[in-house]
């Protein structure tokens, strides 16, 4: 969503999720509990999506949990992988389970998470493939520059943003001592 109400609701969902994780809930349990809270909030609450990614820096394992969120993209030596979980947003149905995915990351891999506003701005019906093709064409660069270029690419297709457009990127590199 967009606007002050959507911003406030998103902030509340993020803060509740953070509090649950900080108190020791597993990510899966936290997402299920947040979904229940949104259901109980009822009509005054709008649907929300949640997209959580955790990287174990010792093992290089990425854990992605999605509830209604758009795909996450991983750039590696072989190309771009799309991690997607086509589910309804939080707060719509009871019993919705977060989709869990794990991937082993290697030196030089990059992770890209975008809001639905970024994908919605892209042309065509298969927006995930448009993003994948774009990511396959970009040169290697730092996470901030990559995020800026992805946002510029998406914005180039629309006269003005109609929704939140957020890009979050991360890279994984071996520490050389």
Name the predicted role of every residue range.
Residues 1-24, 84-87, 94, 105-161, ...:
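Active-site-proximal, acidic helix/loop segment immediately C-terminal to a metal-coordinating Asp/Glu
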Residues 4-77, 84, 98, 154-163, ...:
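Catalytic core of PPM/PP2C metal-dependent serine/threonine phosphatase domains
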Residues 54-56, 104-107:
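Extracellular and analogous surface-interaction loops
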Residues 72, 176-177:
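Short, surface-exposed beta-strand/loop "edge" segments at domain boundaries and coil↔beta transitions
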């Amino acid at each position: 969503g967009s606007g002050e109400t959507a911003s406030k609701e998103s902030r509340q969902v993020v803060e509740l999720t953070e509090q649950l994780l900080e108190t020791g809930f597993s990510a899966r349990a936290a997402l299920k509990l947040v979904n229940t809270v949104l259901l109980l909030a009822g009509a005054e609450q709008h649907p929300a999506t949640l997209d959580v990614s955790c990287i174990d820096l010792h093992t290089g394992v990425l854990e992605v949990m999605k509830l209604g969120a758009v795909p996450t993209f991983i750039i590696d030596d072989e190309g771009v992988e799309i991690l997607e979980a086509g589910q309804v947003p939080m707060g719509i149905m009871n019993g919705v389970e977060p989709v869990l995915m794990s991937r082993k990351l290697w030196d030089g891999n990059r992770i890209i998470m975008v809001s639905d506003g970024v994908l919605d701005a892209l042309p065509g019906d298969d927006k995930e493939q448009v993003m994948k093709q774009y990511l396959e064409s970009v040169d290697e660069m730092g996470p901030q520059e990559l995020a800026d270029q992805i946002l510029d690419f998406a914005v180039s297709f629309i006269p003005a943003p109609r929704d939140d457009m957020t890009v979050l990127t991360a890279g994984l590199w071996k520490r050389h001592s």
